[in-house]
Structures are given as structure tokens and as C-alpha cells.
A protein has these predicted regions:
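Conserved cytosolic headpiece of P-type ATPases
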Residues: 1-775, 779-783, 797, 836, ...
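Generic alpha-helical transmembrane segments
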Residues: 753, 830-847
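A C-terminal functional module that forms or caps the active site or interfaces directly
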Residues: 850
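Helix-coil boundary and interhelical linker segments in multi-pass alpha-helical membrane proteins
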Residues: 731-742, 809-830
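Membrane-helix interface motif
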Residues: 804-818, 884-889
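Membrane-water interface at loop-to-transmembrane-helix junctions
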Residues: 779-797, 825-834
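Alpha-helical transmembrane segments of multi-pass integral membrane proteins
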Residues: 791-806, 841
Length: 926
């Protein structure tokens, strides 16, 4: 077996005879003894899976994260506080979250299994001079393997014989056009392994023709195996949101435990409470600071965003990926199928007399031939008629229309030829009638050395005085050299002079600069002395041909892509094209759709990238850049370099070759239509329409999710201050002021009235202008200084003042003074009920304040968010139940309140909304 990449590349430079020597085999194949020895040396032709964490440990890990432990503790505290149902509910939320996370991680680990599915089960080999069908896993280096149309190739190898062989290497390169294969030595310098036409690779498929090759690499040594090795050995990084939640729970834990210990010690030393009561009191304070609804709210917010994204053709496999999209600063996008249609379309027709545009996109036959916007009919233009008809006659591809089983066009054959069929249909030609008019008698297939193909047709009605013609299509320069004449727009055949030849080459060069693929079409009327199978040799059929014109085609940009890229630029998101296509084509498309905006953009080929060290690559990544003809590990390397520069990277891909980069990226995006199972398993998100614009919609949702989590945190932490301040009054008055808010009342707020509005804030739609701001920095915190000041100081102190005002006002109204405040009985319970009610009703106003984001309260549509509206109704209903149903009076230390008290409570939300609007107009609006 060839061990090094460099030795493998050298195989492409050897003639077939030398390949047998290098790989120590013969045209009769290996002997049985040699096979046994090599199986012992090299092992089976299989992809190996690296050792993984036991499934039970993975399962257990999802229930012991810091936030999970906080929730287990919160549930336990609730049970200690005589609230068994609430404690069980918290634990159920924890179990559901843990199970969901485990399932997501388990599914994401199946990429290697999907890779194995792409390898065939059997192979046809020559051993001991006899053909045999064996298990593909039993192949060894040196085996002589037969392949034909439809076969999936089972190992890497060097071709030693071919017959019209074409191989689809899209699984490795991402480019869907079949590659014409050769068995001849290729001495072209500076080629990568995948660029050698005389090499074949495991996991690719034979599109047409046949051949046989000598196995040079098996299992993990193949290109396929190296991709598998890269893919499965990548450590699964935590998403930015997961890292943030870990950081947040640590902060909350420190705050909660510190406050709890402080109040327990203070209650014991200064108020002389028994240690058991002080402990329960401290537990209540810890509960006040633990956001029990954090995980379910985050999960719901992400899940609702996932639902909205699904409507925009983006299926998210991993919930935390939604927010990661919101932090994305760079998108590394493939070209074919994502930015472009993945459908070759004829855009221009050129003759020595005129040039024409062709409208329509993709393989649909809607469109027409135009000249300066005016439709052109073939009936009035014989030159154009011949160019279009003959292009189709020399095509072997078929376009299968969408059906109930397959909603997309299916191409049988070469996509370059398929678009010639579509061109003919746009021109009004019936394809079957065209074949009937000029049935094919012979074909000289396309050859990568000749760069053209030729067909022979019989015309019953005749053409130019002959009933037989040959048609040649291929590379313009090669076809032009076969021509002695050209056909003009007057129906005349004229001599092709140096002037016309220069014009043809100039037109071809211009099309190439525009990123178009160009075919030239020519024909030759065959006179009677050249009729007959024995006379149709290449020299005869391709001699003294008549030049018709050029057909220029491209994989056109998708509709809406340019607008999506402009949106990314406004949002300060860079787009970097990383493609397997050629540099000029890639740069042309990049300019056309706005990825590249300057004239000094750099195109880096895979070969050039291989010569760069990491520092040079990072420096190159700072400017406008397009990567072309890159290998799988190079795409991975580009992603890694960007991450080391501090970028949050999203990567799109559809092939097996994209799997390592998809897994390495912060967010991997696979194509749902054209993508392989391997790409889909490796990705975090799947685009059901393969459209780049869908990623941009997803980024918008991701940004909204982060803002929604901040809104939710602001909302729930607002009530922490008014929950803690009453306890401070109790402690600092040395018990002379009775406890204005009990532990059970704190639990009623945190696990009851606050939950539904908080969940509603988690599903707010994206704010206006969310894509006009740069992505958040990774150093930005969910619980940042601004949020802490806003929640605990500004909003918190307002709520605390309103809550304590309600408490003291109740005593003042009912007792006439604030001396000797009762610490038990109906008056005390009524006062604590007012404290509880003031916090609940102020939180209603806070729900509206949180919804407004960076704008004015008057911009908020009060009933647009149904969950918040329902939550407000439910918290009012819950407060009424706690206040007026006698069963709850003892448990929650509540009592009925009067109409005057209700007027105070109903004013609370409007007070906090008014104060926030004043603050906004004085500070934020400016």
C-alpha cells in the first residue's frame, strides 16, 4: 500500500506498466497467497470508529451539569418548604431537558455510521487470473478491481484501463459534474491527488463507461478514511450559549449561596431565630435567586425559533445551535447549490454574426432566446436554428421532470449537456422530434485529451446537399482548429480566416473571465464517399468542419442570494467562498453576488494553501479572499484558523468532503436536497431548500433568541430585589418589622406567577433592526453589568419600593400608625398579601418593559404576544386564588384585601412603565 500522500500522487505520473511494478501486482491480479499475506499486513478495508465515551456515562453527564444540579437543589428546597408538587415539577423539567440534550448528542455522533453506508458491500476483482466477486472489506492493496456504470468504488486506486469512463466525485469534491477518466500517465506539475484523472477514490460512483484499477489504499488510508478520521476525532465543542449558561449558573450559584448564608447567619445572630428556622429562611432566599424557569424558558425560546426557522427551510438538529447562529461573524459557504442553482443554465449564444441572451434559470424550460430584449424565433434565423438543434443532437444527457416522488429535476448524465436540452426546449424544439429528424448513427465519446465529442446523424430530408452530417462540440480552441469554414446569418458557408478565428478566441476569453463555461459547436456535411461505418474514423468526421458558434453557460446564482449577502454585510458578517470549483469561476460568481466587492480580492487555490503556514493563512484571511480547489482537510484548516482569530464560524456543505469542516465549525449547515447523509449527520442544521438566504433568516432568529434570553433574565431578576429587601427590613430592624414576604410567597412568585410571562418573553420575534448591528462578541455576557444594574438596581429598587410601600400602607390605613406592627393575625397576613400583590402586578408592567427592547413602551403592541397575555391573566387569577380561597391562606400566609388595596395594585404596572419611559427619553433616546 502507498503510505504517504506524496507517493500516492506520484502514482498518477506513472504509465500503467510501471503502476503494476510499484504496487507489486500483475495483469492477472494477486495470487491467493499474496492476498492472505496482505490481509494480515494491512487488515480489512473498513472505516474504524475511535473509542467513545460509554453511553451510560454520556446519559448521566446530562443530568449533572451545574444548571441541572441547581434545579435538583431547587426542587429539593421546594419540597422542604412543603411544596411537593412544585418540587416534582422542577425535577420533571430537569429530566426532560436532560433527555432532550442526550438524544441530540447521540444523534450527532452518528456521522461515521453514515460514512460506512457510502461504501459498497461487494467488489469484482481479478485474482489468480480469474474474475471473482468478493466482500469489499476483503480488498487489499494490489487487487485489480473492475468497475462499470452504477458501481460505487470501494477503495482508492490507479486506473490501468478505461472505456469512456466518467466518475462522479461530488462526495469528495462537492462538484457534481462527472470527471472523465484516463489510464494514461499525467505529468502535469503541481496537481493535488483529487485532480488526477487517472485516479479513483473510495465512496465515489461510476457515472458511465467502465474500467479497472489497482488498489493503492484501503480503509482509513483512503481519502474517505482520512475524512472519517478527521470527523470522528473532533471533540464536540460547547456552543457559545452553552458556555454562557455555564458561566451564568456559576454566577447565580455564588450569588444565591452567598445571600442565603448571609441571611441564615444574620437571622441566627441578630434576630435569634432557631437554627432550623434560619436554615429554611436561607433556603427561601436561595430559591429567590435560582431561576428555576431558566432552562425551560431557554429551551422554549430555542424551540419556538426552530419552528419559525423550519418555515424558512432551516431544520435545526441541536437547539443551542440557534443562538450560535446569532453570534456568527463569518460564514464559509460552498458555491455549488448553495450560492448557485446547482443547475447549469445556458446564458449566452454567440456566432460570428450576432450574440444572444437566454432567459430562465435552472432546468425548467421557461425562458426564451432574446437579442436586446427582443424574442428571437429559430424560424427566422437558420444559423441560430442549427446551433441550438445540433447542440442538442450531440448531447447524451436527459432531464427528468419533477414528480410526486421527487419534487426536483433529476439529471441523467452530464449537467453541461443537460442544459443544452433545456436550451432546445426554450427555443421551441421538441426533443423527440429532433432525434427523429436526425437519428444518431455513431458517437466518438468525449475524451479529456481531445476535449470534444463527435456524433454522426442521418437526415432523411438532407442538409447542404448531404443526408449525413457529423457534429462536434467541445472546447472552443480545439473545435475551432478543426474548422475551415463558418456558417453566417445569411445562410452562407464562408472561409474561416485569421480575423474570424481571433474573434472566436476573444469571445471565448471574455466568457471565461465572466466565469462562464463555453462549448463550441461545428458540423460537417458528409458526401457519398464518406458514408459507411468503416469510413467514419475520427480524422474523416472532424476534418474541414463548419463553425456555428459558442454556447456559454453557468451555474447561475440563486434568486435572493445577492440580497441575503447584502443583509449579511449590514450585519457585519463576512462571507468567504470555499469551493472545489476553479478559481476564475469562483471569483466571478463571488463578484456577481457581492461576496467580493473590491478589485484586490485574492484567490487562493488548494495548492497555494498547502504552501502556507498558519500565520500566513491568518494574515490572508484578514482581506477579501476566495478559496478554490480545496481539499477536505484544507477546508477544516480554514475554519480552525478563523476560530483562532476569534471568529464564530458557520460552514455550509453537502458532500462527504465537508464533514470534518461541518463538525469543526461553531455551526455546521448541511444541504437537505443535494446533501449526503454524512454531511447531514455531521451538521447542526439542515437547509431543506439548499438556499443561502435561509441561513440569513436563521442568523436573524439566532440574534433574536439571545436578546430574548436577556429580556427573560432581566424580567426574572427584577423580582429578586423586592424578594430580598423585605428580608433585609426584617433583619436590620432586629425583627421589630415583621417579615413582609414569606418563603412560600417567594416560591409562589418564582415558580408560579413569573413563569408564564417569562416563557412569553422567550418567544418574542426579532426586533426591528436586529440585522443592522454587528454580531455580539464572544466576550459579551448574558448577565452583563448593564443587565445587573438594570435588573437589581433600577427595576429592582422600584419594585422593592412599591412592595414595601404596599406593606406599610396597609398597616397605616388599618392601624393608623407604624408603631408595634403586628407579626401575626389577619392584619399581618393582609400586609404580606399586599407585598406579594405589589410584586406580581409590578412584574406585569415589567413584562411590557422587557418586550420593548431598546425602544419606547409606546412601540409595544400589548396583545401581540399571546403567551405573555395569557401569562398576565394567569398570574392575576393565581393571585386572586391565593388571596380569596381560604385553603391557601395558611400555606401562603395570605388574606382577603379590600377595593382600595386593589387600586394601589392596579397602579403598580403603570408606575414602573412610566418611570422606565422617562428614563428612556432622558438617556437612551438621545
Amino acid at each position: 500500500m502507498v503510505d504517504s500522500r506524496q507517493e500516492h500522487i506520484k502514482l498518477g505520473t506513472y504509465p500503467p506498466e510501471q503502476v503494476y511494478q510499484v504496487l507489486q501486482t500483475s495483469p492477472q491480479g494477486l495470487s491467493s497467497q499474496e492476498v492472505k499475506e496482505r490481509q494480515a499486513t494491512y487488515g480489512p478495508n473498513q472505516l474504524k470508529e475511535s473509542k467513545k465515551e460509554p453511553i451510560w456515562l454520556t446519559f448521566f453527564r446530562h443530568f449533572t451539569s451545574l444548571m441541572a444540579l441547581l434545579l435538583w437543589g431547587g426542587g429539593f428546597i421546594a419540597m422542604l418548604s412543603h411544596s411537593l408538587e412544585l418540587g416534582i415539577a422542577i425535577w420533571l423539567v430537569n429530566i426532560i431537558n436532560g433527555l432532550f440534550s442526550f438524544i441530540q448528542e447521540y444523534r450527532a455522533s452518528q456521522a461515521t455510521a453514515a460514512l460506512n453506508k457510502l461504501l459498497p458491500s461487494y467488489a469484482r476483482v481479478l485474482r489468480d487470473g480469474k474474475e471473482d466477486k468478493i466482500l469489499a472489506q476483503d480488498l487489499v492493496p494490489g487487487d485489480l478491481v473492475f468497475i462499470e456504470e452504477g458501481d460505487r468504488i470501494s477503495a482508492d486506486g490507479r486506473l490501468v484501463a478505461v472505456t469512456d469512463l466518467q466518475v462522479n466525485q461530488s462526495a469528495l469534491t462537492g462538484e457534481s459534474n462527472p470527471i472523465y477518466k484516463s489510464d494514461q500517465a499525467d505529468l502535469t506539475p503541481d496537481k493535488t491527488e483529487l485532480e488526477y484523472d487517472n485516479m479513483v477514490f473510495a465512496g465515489t460512483t461510476v457515472s458511465s463507461g467502465s474500467g479497472h484499477f489497482i488498489v493503492s489504499a484501503i480503509g482509513m488510508k483512503t481519502e474517505f478514511g482520512q475524512i472519517a478520521d478527521l470527523t470522528q476525532n473532533l471533540a464536540q465543542e460547547k456552543s457559545p450559549l452553552q458556555k454562557e449558561l455555564d458561566h451564568l449558573t456559576k454566577q447565580i450559584s455564588v450569588i444565591a449561596v452567598s445571600v442565603g448564608l448571609f441571611f441564615m447567619v444574620a437571622a441566627t445572630l441578630f434576630v435569634h431565630q432557631p437554627l432550623s428556622q434560619a436554615f429554611i429562611f436561607a433556603l427561601g432566599m436561595i430559591v429567590a435567586f435560582i431561576p428555576e424557569g431558566l432552562l425551560p424558558t431557554v429551551t422554549l425560546s430555542l424551540a419556538m425559533a426552530v419552528q419559525r426557522m423550519a418555515k424558512d427551510h432551516a431544520l435545526v438538529k441541536k437547539l443551542s445551535s440557534v443562538e450560535t447562529l446569532g453570534a456568527t461573524s463569518v460564514i464559509c459557504s460552498d458555491k455549488t447549490g448553495t450560492l448557485t442553482q446547482n443547475a447549469m443554465t445556458v446564458n449566452h449564444l454567440w456566432t460570428l454574426s450576432d450574440s444572444y441572451e437566454v432567459t430562465g434559470l435552472g432546468y425548467a424550460s421557461e425562458g426564451q432566446i432574446e437579442q436586446e430584449g427582443r424574442p428571437i424565433s429559430l424560424e427566422d434565423n437558420e444559423l441560430l436554428n442549427r446551433l441550438v438543434r445540433f447542440s442538442h443532437l450531440a448531447s447524451n444527457a436527459q432531464v427528468v421532470a419533477p414528480s410526486a416522488d421527487n419534487p426536483n429535476f433529476t439529471i441523467l448524465g452530464d449537467p453541461t449537456e443537460a442544459c443544452l436540452n433545456v436550451l432546445a426546449e426554450k427555443a421551441g424544439i421538441n426533443l423527440n422530434d429532433n432525434h427523429t429528424w436526425a437519428p444518431r448513427l455513431k458517437e466518438i465519446p468525449f475524451d479529456s485529451d481531445r476535449k470534444r465529442m463527435t456524433t454522426v446523424h442521418k437526415l432523411e430530408l438532407g442538409l447542404d446537399g448531404s443526408q449525413h452530417i457529423s457534429i462536434t462540440k467541445g472546447a472552443p480552441k480545439e473545435v475551432m482548429e478543426l474548422c475551415s469554414d463558418y456558417y453566417d446569418n445569411q445562410g452562407m458557408i464562408k472561409s474561416l480566416t485569421a480575423t474570424e478565428r481571433q474573434a472566436i478566441l476573444a469571445a471565448n476569453d471574455q466568457f471565461a473571465r465572466d466565469g462562464l463555461r463555453v462549448l463550441a459547436v461545428a458540423y460537417r456535411p458528409l458526401d457519398s464517399e464518406h458514408i459507411g461505418e468503416d469510413k467514419w474514423d475520427m480524422q474523416t468526421l472532424e476534418d474541414n468542419m463548419v463553425f456555428l458558434g459558442l454556447v456559454a453557460m453557468s451555474d447561475s446564482p440563486r434568486q435572493g442570494v445577492r440580497e441575503a449577502i447584502e443583509k449579511c454585510h449590514r450585519a457585519s458578517i463576512r462571507i468567504i467562498m470555499v469551493t472545489g470549483d476553479y478559481g476564475l469561476t469562483a471569483l466571478s460568481i463571488a463578484k456577481k453576488i457581492g461576496i467580493v466587492q473590491g478589485d484586490d480580492a485574492r484567490v487562493v487555490s488548494g495548492l497555494e494553501l498547502a504552501g502556507m503556514d498558519d500565520n500566513q493563512l491568518k494574515e490572508a484571511l484578514k482581506g477579501e479572499i476566495v478559496f478554490a480547489r480545496v481539499a477536505p482537510e484544507q477546508k477544516y484548516r480554514v475554519v480552525n484558523a478563523l476560530q483562532e482569530l476569534g471568529e464564530v464560524v458557520a460552514v455550509t456543505g453537502d458532500g462527504v468532503n465537508d464533514a470534518p469542516a461541518l463538525k469543526k465549525a461553531d455551526i455546521g449547515v448541511a444541504m437537505g436536497v443535494s446533501g449526503t447523509d454524512v454531511a447531514k449527520e455531521s451538521a447542526d442544521m439542515i437547509l431543506t431548500d439548499d438556499h443561502f438566504a435561509s441561513i440569513v433568516h436563521a442568523v436573524e432568529e439566532g440574534r433574536a433568541v439571545y436578546r430574548n434570553i436577556q429580556k427573560f433574565l432581566t424580567y426574572i431578576f427584577n423580582s429578586n430585589t423586592p424578594e430580598a429587601v423585605p428580608s433585609a427590613f426584617f433583619l436590620f430592624s432586629l425583627g421589630r418589622i415583621p417579615l413582609p414576604l414569606t418563603v412560600m410567597q417567594i416560591l409562589a412568585i418564582d415558580l408560579g406567577t413569573d413563569m408564564m410571562p417569562a416563557l412569553g418573553l422567550g418567544v418574542e420575534p426579532p426586533e426591528e433592526g436586529v440585522m443592522d448591528r454587528p454580531p455580539r462578541r464572544l466576550s459579551d455576557r448574558l448577565l452583563n453589568r448593564q443587565l445587573l444594574i438594570k435588573a437589581f438596581v433600577w427595576y429592582g429598587l422600584i419594585e422593592a419600593a412599591l412592595a414595601m410601600g404596599a406593606f406599610f400602607l396597609n398597616y397605616w390605613v388599618n392601624q393608623g400608625n407604624l408603631n408595634h406592627l403586628a407579626s401575626s393575625g389577619p392584619l399581618y397576613r393582609e400586609a404580606t398579601t399586599m407585598t406579594l400583590g405589589a410584586i406580581i402586578f409590578t412584574q406585569i408592567g415589567m413584562a411590557m418593559n422587557s418586550r420593548k427592547g431598546r425602544g419606547s413602551i409606546f412601540q409595544v403592541k400589548p396583545f401581540a404576544n399571546r403567551i405573555i397575555s395569557l401569562g398576565i391573566v394567569l398570574e392575576i387569577v393565581l393571585f386572586i386564588i391565593l388571596t380569596y380561597v381560604p385553603f391557601f391562606h395558611t400555606l401562603f400566609n395570605t388574606a382577603p384585601i379590600g377595593l382600595d388595596d386593589w387600586l394601589y395594585l392596579l397602579a403598580c404596572p403603570f408606575v414602573i412603565m412610566a418611570l422606565e419611559e422617562i428614563r428612556y427619553r432622558l438617556f437612551d433616546k438621545k
